Amino acid sequence: MPIDAAPITDLRALARQWPRTGRLEAIVLRPARGQAAVEVATTEAIAGRGLQGDRTGDKARTSPLGGKRQVTLLQAEHLPLIAAFAGTAQPAATQLRRNLVVSGLNLLAARSPFADQTVHLHLGDEVVLELTGPCDPCSKMEALLGPGGYNAMRGHGGLTARVLRSGRLRVGDAVWACVAAEPAPQTTDQAG
């Protein structure tokens, strides 16, 4: 016998609701390729570029929107899962080299399932990001997490984003998602 349930009448309305606000748990900067990542308490997000002090944010951009991988984000709740799948201790945020670690807000749900409904991620009082895609793990995860480390991170490697509005980021900032008032600008950037 089927369970009575209210029908879903407006999936778009459901996709606009989040149960709670998240929190920025860590800010990680990667000064240069091959250099150790560093955790900081605050940094500046620069529209169309990335984070000040990070190798992607310090690069000059030719497109006004910049590339699609200006900032990388990781779900804090995925850290213990990655460790469990790899059979290792929980890795530090700096080891995984993702710029922003967020807890309490499902980052995957902050990507709209509808092409004509853009969702923006707000961090603190100023910064606005647009999530642009998955941040797949690289082969360095094998060395970090051991054999199978790459596969331990698959599906949990985080997301990439572009900075739409500049501002100061601080560990502890509130993070929330909302549907944009108008669609985000489109780009034909191929470097992304």
Each model region followed by its residue ranges:
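Metal-cofactor-dependent catalytic cores
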Residues: 1-192
